[in-house]
Structure formats: structure tokens, C-alpha cells
């Protein structure tokens, strides 16, 4: 177990994920967690994350100083290195010039850099700088701009690095993290097989012979959860609410795959109910609230008619847990659609087997449980479905237009081998009509926007650089096969400033 103490870095979750990729279990705690809270987890090593603050700020977040004399192996990254150096008597100064972007380690030595030869590219992002290590510590790496790029304690159990080994822009960063894990003697048994074994044991012990209810959306999290319950042999009912806002053939695909793998699945046809409630509504937030309300009503009806159930299983992931426990206010970006808001007379105990897992770990479990790749590798899809990709009022006619266009875009991505190279791809039907030409006549057709992004964690995202030849083929095929669409555009906006979805 390795604990990552979070000082506000945008890369904190990435550090935890990288450690798990190296098969070391990791958890994230607030940077100011007291020593007692840290030791309760029985960690084999600690990592102090980076952060946006300066160690000279009066209210800068700081760790419990007792951590530095706890004897635990320690790695400070960027701001974490500056905290470590300052606390132990080194010298930290406000840098005359900030160091951002790629840099080269022109010198590196010692076991933390074992296996690395020559100049090593790293990613810097700091303003303050350690200019002298603590007494007895050694400088073990430097760049042309920074003579103190990494430091090591006298006993070789604690290190600080001014760069970010966790990011892709430090190509040998995983080797550095792996070296630290070896130096710390951290256990490396966090394999998908081990995780599955532990989850099956947990679910069987917790649920016993009691009944479990869960909602299935067709996404990888809920589908994998349904398979886990089936594999564990617990008495479960998976409810798939067809709200009429699904993609082309989605209901049939989900139904066929899950039933074939032993999931006790109930499909609720609620298309008419949802479309009636959405009639005339154009505001995106209002659409989300209506869909959430109607989903709860449909799901609650099943719970009453098929109950009683003791447990409600949910596919809550570790990032959800981190955000809930963060304690730092954040502006509401969008209303989130979930099974929350159930009536008070429906009381369940929550069963959340994935609460300590990241999305990529759930995908690994899905592979072990036999979930077809068409579902396992499926891009994220919003709970409100196509309702937030049909801008303006949602009608059956506009949904059908979008379904056909979206299917063409997705199929073409697969044909070109691009689907798995982007994190999310979608089509958006705008309420704008544009003039075009059909034969010798002018016609007005809808404007369709295509969007594809690449991202590590969905917190930020970059627009995908799809080949122009691909985009040309997509536009031609869509306008040819979906005559209601007269113009196709491609969204070049990253997140931020935009969100991935348009609504």
C-alpha cells in the first residue's frame, strides 16, 4: 500500500493510477492528514504530490511534520519536494524564472534512476526551487536550468524530484516510480485477478442471501457490476430502463450480452413516458432534471413491485469518492444523473464494490468477467442519453436522425481503427438549419457537429486530431445516408474552456 498525500495537484489521481499500473495498491489522502490517519492505513511508502501553491504562502497546505521522522519511505514531487526540503532544513527560494515544460536531466545518479542512461527528458512545472538540499542529503539530478532537480536522503529511503514522473511527458517516469517502489519494498500484488478475487469475496460476505437491486445503463461500470453479482452468485435484479434516448441498437446489444452471461436482467420500456415529459423542453438543465426524475420514478416502481431488496448496488468509482470527500467547494458544471433521490420509503444499504477502483481497472475486470469488447471498450455515454446531444427540444424524429448519424460516425471510427485511439466520440444534432443543394434545388438541412477528444482522466481533454481524409469521408457518408442533415462540422474546442458534451 502506497499513500499519496494530495496538495492540490492536477496530477494527483494520475500518480495513484500510475502506481496501480505498476501493481502497487494506492490511496489518496488530504495533504494535511495527521500521522495517526496515515498510519491507520499501514502504508509501505508515502508520496507527496505537487500543488499550485508556494511554500512561502502563509496558508499553503502542509503535511504533518511528524511524517518526516516516521521512518516511512518518502517521495516528494515538485511542491512535495519543496515541502520536504523546507521542513528538513534545506533551502527553497522563489525562482527568478519559472520552469515549465520539457527539460533534460543532464546528470542523474543513484538507485532512483537505475536503468536510465544518458540525458533523460522530464516535465517541469514550478516557480519556487530547492537551491540546497537538507543537511546530509545529496543532489542526485540536475538540468541546465536547475542544479537541484532531485535529492536523496542519507539512508536512501527518501527522495525529492522537482519534475513530474507521473506524466506522459516524462517518458521514463514509470521506471523512476518503479525504482522507488522497489526501494520502498512495496507489495506489487494489485493484479486484476487479485482484485476480482477480493471483490467476489466481499460481495458474497456482504450480501449473503439478501437480495440486491441495481440499475444498468449499458456502460462499462454498471455492466461489469451486474456481471460481478452474477459471478458471485448473489440474488440480484439488474434493471435496464429504456428511456428512448439510447443509441442505435443499444438496447438489444446490452440485453443480449448480459443475459448470455447469466445476469438476471429486467428491461423496462419507458420510452413513451420520457418523451412525453420532455415535450416542449429546450433548456439542458431542465432536460437533465426531468430525465433524472422520470428515471427515479420508473426505477422505484420496479423496486416496489419486485421487492423487497436489502441492497442497492452502484458502480461508484474511486474518483467519485475522492470528489465527495474533497471538502473543497467546486462550481456545479452539470447536474449529474444517478440513482440518487430515491423516495424515503425505499431504504437500501449501499453496495459499492468499485468504490476504490479507477475506470481502467473496471475495464480490466470486465475483460476477466467476459464482457464483450463492444461494451467493455465503449466510450462514456451520459445518463440522459441522446437528450443532451439533441440540442433544443427532444422529439422522436430528431432522435432518429441523430441515431443514424451517430452510428455512421462510430462505425467509421472503427473501420479506420480510430475508435480506441480517442477517449470519447459523439455526434450532436444542432437546432440550426443550413442551406444546401440537392440536385438542382436548394434545401435546408440540420447542421450536425462531430466531436472526438483524447484525455487521461476526463478532467481535461484535447480535441482529437482525426485525419482530414477521415472527416471528409464522415461528412460525405452522413449527408448521403441521412438526407435530413445538410452540413457537418467538427468541434475543435478543448476542455477547458468547453466541456466534452455540448449540453
UniProtKB/Swiss-Prot annotation:
Its EC number is 6.3.5.2. The active site is at residues 78, 164, 166. This is GMP synthase [glutamine-hydrolyzing]. It catalyses: XMP + L-glutamine + ATP + H2O = GMP + L-glutamate + AMP + diphosphate + 2 H(+). SUPFAM superfamilies: Adenine nucleotide alpha hydrolases-like, Class I glutamine amidotransferase-like, GMP synthetase C-terminal dimerisation domain. Residues 190-378 form the GMPS ATP-PPase domain. Keywords: ATP-binding, Glutamine amidotransferase, GMP biosynthesis, Ligase, Nucleotide-binding, Purine biosynthesis. The lineage of its organism: Bacteria, Thermotogati, Deinococcota, Deinococci, Thermales. ATP binds at residues 217-223. Catalyzes the synthesis of GMP from XMP. The gene is guaA. InterPro entries: Class_I_gatase-like (IPR029062), GATASE (IPR017926), GMP_synth_C (IPR001674), GMP_synth_GATase (IPR004739), GMP_synthase (IPR022955), GMPS_ATP_PPase_dom (IPR025777), Rossmann-like_a/b/a_fold (IPR014729). Pathway: Purine metabolism; GMP biosynthesis; GMP from XMP (L-Gln route): step 1/1. GO terms for cellular component: cytosol. GO terms for molecular function: ATP binding; GMP synthase activity. Homodimer. CDD domains: GATase1_GMP_Synthase, GMP_synthase_C. The keyword Transmembrane helix does not apply. Residues 1-189 form the Glutamine amidotransferase type-1 domain.
